[in-house]
């Protein structure tokens, strides 16, 4: 494949990610036996990729991916992207909060015979969970004392309170 072919296939596939009715076509760019690296668990192949993205879209129905940079060389494409969405369904065990997220990610693709045959995914899940208020960083910095864990944002506190109220109202 030429650089232009790879660029077109990659651009088209990631544009499909944002089309509610065309999301299934996102997977057309991938080989059935695509090797996946960096995804949670032991996901492999097109079925694993599909399961990951369908869970993401269920949790964040308005998820939008914007390719910020695309570099193509040889049989590889490197993407720097921004992923945004609103938490409307369960995500990695976290019930919906109604909060939004905005993260950047990196992906490296290897293509052959007109399909993505290997993908290296730089995980964004922890950054998303932090923005949803589900996890907190309490990491010591070099030369500094360990700090108290950060408090949840006002929006995260409000969402947690709403969730607790809904759970209390449920039978």
Where are these regions (language model features)?
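C-terminal and inter-domain tail/linker signature
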Residues: 1-171
């Amino acid at each position: 494949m030429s650089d232009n072919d790879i660029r077109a296939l990659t651009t088209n596939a990631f544009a499909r990610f944002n089309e509610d009715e065309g999301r299934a076509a996102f997977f057309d760019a991938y080989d059935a036996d695509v090797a996946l690296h960096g995804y949670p668990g032991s996901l492999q192949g097109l079925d694993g990729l599909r399961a990951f993205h369908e869970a993401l879209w269920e949790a964040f129905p308005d998820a939008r991916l914007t390719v910020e940079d695309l570099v193509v060389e040889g049989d590889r494409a490197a993407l720097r992207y921004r992923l945004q969405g609103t938490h409307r369904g369960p995500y990695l065990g976290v019930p919906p909060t109604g909060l939004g997220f905005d993260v950047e990610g990196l992906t490296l693709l290897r293509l052959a015979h007109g399909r993505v045959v290997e993908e290296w995914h730089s995980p964004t899940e922890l950054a998303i969970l932090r923005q949803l208020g589900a996890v907190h960083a309490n990491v010591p910095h070099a030369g500094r004392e360990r700090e108290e864990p950060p408090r949840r944002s006002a929006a995260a506190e409000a969402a947690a309170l709403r969730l607790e109220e809904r759970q209390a109202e449920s039978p």
